[in-house]
Amino acid sequence: MSFDVGKDKLYIQDVTLRDGMHAIRHMYGIDHVRAIAQALDEAGVDAIEVAHGDGLNGASFNYGFGAHTDWEWLEAVADVLTRSVLTTLILPGVGTVDELRRAYDIGVRSVRVATHCTEADVSKQHIGIARDLGMDVSGFLMMSHMIEPEALAQQALLMESYGAQCVYVTDSGGALDMDGVRARFQAYDRVLRPETQRGMHAHHNLSLGVANSIVAAQQGAVRIDASLAGMGAGAGNAPLEVFIAAVDRKGWNHGCDVNALMDAAEDLVRPLQDRPVRVDRETLALGYAGVYSSFLRHAEKAAADYGLDTRTILVELGRRKMVGGQEDMIVDVALDLVRERGAAA
């Protein structure tokens, strides 16, 4: 661990325009992304991630189609940034190296290469090509709660060996608590080089997004993901304006204007939420069952279509250990539950 939270500046990575896509079914308009990005840039955020919620080339029947293409969103944001680093996310197998090169041509200079927490080996080509392009590259180990800290650290070590300059603990299910976060970063410290940065991507399904991010920073995570008004899958990400307010009270160096972030969250982002991004019975079920946060809207639709309780579907998905990319199985699970209900009648 080379980062000292008491002395060094945090790297604030906003995800409103990528993870936040899930909250509104990838329906951001061009004017929306431009206004939000400009506000974030002016507020001093270090980097702004832009893509379909499931990364470059994520638009599909499985994940959902967006109001615009990745390229339209990225070009709109690239036009307004003056200091924040334009960032994107790519899932190997969903996005190809061709998409990575095209993103670079638009102006993307930082990328997070995301895999399920046990599948770091599929990130090798994407990390290598991103490094060859001269990009800043982070490894993004999704659903980090699903394996033990030492096993996660071995996956992080693979990403480091491929060239990742930072590796994340990615709590996609919002299922980790502070002890779980601490244990995972301590495991990282035992195997990763000190110069390899650590990052934290929290979800707020158990209302621990801010607390987990603070603990991560105390354990050496320099890069912290957050979003305006928590705009993200499930109960959202760590709310950016709340995290900055909390660490500002601690005297940590974050470089952001907290009032500007509050204004952007309230005036630009919250009005776009067709479903409130908050902890409620459905989003709490995500964290409780350890389910991928972006399953929420899919599960709610299946519940409405088949007369089920969303929580019942989510808990069953958790029991079956479904992971990102298996959105098409949500309807199958719902049909199984309908059959079981009929058999019991």
Curated annotation (Swiss-Prot):
Q: Which domain of life is it from?
A: Bacteria
Query: Which parts of the sequence bind substrate?
Result: 18-19, 172, 201, 292
**Which InterPro entries does the annotation name?**
2-IPM_HCS-like, 4OH_2_O-val_aldolase, Aldolase_TIM, DmpG_comm, DRE_TIM_HOA, PYR_CT
Q: Pfam families, from UniProt? A: DmpG_comm, HMGL-like
Which GO annotations describe the biological process of this protein?
catabolic process; L-leucine biosynthetic process
Keyword check for Glycoprotein: no
**Substrates-to-products reaction catalysed:** (S)-4-hydroxy-2-oxopentanoate = acetaldehyde + pyruvate
- The EC number on file is 4.1.3.39
Catalytic residues per the record? 22 (proton acceptor)
Q: Which GO terms describe its molecular function?
A: 2-isopropylmalate synthase activity; 4-hydroxy-2-oxovalerate aldolase activity; manganese ion binding
* Residue intervals of the Pyruvate carboxyltransferase domain: 10-262
CDD domains, sorted = DRE_TIM_HOA
* Site (Transition state stabilizer) residue list: 18
- What does the similarity note say? Belongs to the 4-hydroxy-2-oxovalerate aldolase family.
The molecule here is called: 4-hydroxy-2-oxovalerate aldolase 2
Give the source species.
Rhizorhabdus wittichii (strain DSM 6014 / CCUG 31198 / JCM 15750 / NBRC 105917 / EY 4224 / RW1)
